[in-house]
């Protein structure tokens, strides 16, 4: 299996789920991709510049991008850093999954988060290529084997859910709830709207999430 380029955020109570707020359920939240300002600037000089170990600006800190972003959000929740625009997405998701019953910090301490696409894009309107998605598949399986989630919650249908790999996948209804079979265990996966979508409603999404996940 291929190691992920962007290491996942793993909440402390995901690691020790016995008394977590989801009744012991280990939830993997699957996002889409990262935006990289460094890549944006590189593209001004070299249109072929691409995210990864071969990027001329690669540093080992690139691998902790996902974890660093989540930690920055948690620091904001603690009053330790200033607000940034992306934090609205993380807050809206936390409110959707908890129905406003828990703080965003509590939610993020109880879940794992991983962006499926393992190659950042240079700005928010740019989309990963089909090659980028394909090359992210093996790392996704590696994450499932290592984190052993009980359920996967996808942020978005077209960009995330529909680009996850078909190997080991079964979808009885052909649309929403299906499952991966990894090491003999079935891992259900479903999707909600991406919380960055302007029309995202935590109340509406909570109704869908509550069919599969309950806050205790």
Predicted regions and their residues:
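C-terminal capping/extension of enzyme domains
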Residues: 3, 127-141, 160-216
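Short, solvent-exposed loop/turn segments at secondary-structure junctions
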Residues: 32-37, 117-121, 157-161, 194-198
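Active-site and ligand/interface coordination hotspots across diverse enzymes
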Residues: 1-82, 136-143, 176-179, 212-216
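Surface-exposed cleft-lining segments at the edges of enzyme active sites
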Residues: 70-86, 117-132
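Extracellular/periplasmic catalytic domains that process cell-envelope and extracellular macromolecules
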Residues: 20-24, 105-106, 146, 182-184
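Short, contiguous, well-structured surface segments enriched in hydrophobic/aromatic residues
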Residues: 102-117
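Hydrophobic/aromatic beta-strand patches that form the interior of the parallel beta-sheet core
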Residues: 28, 112-114, 151-153, 188-190
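Proline-aspartate-enriched helix->loop->beta-strand connector
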Residues: 140-157
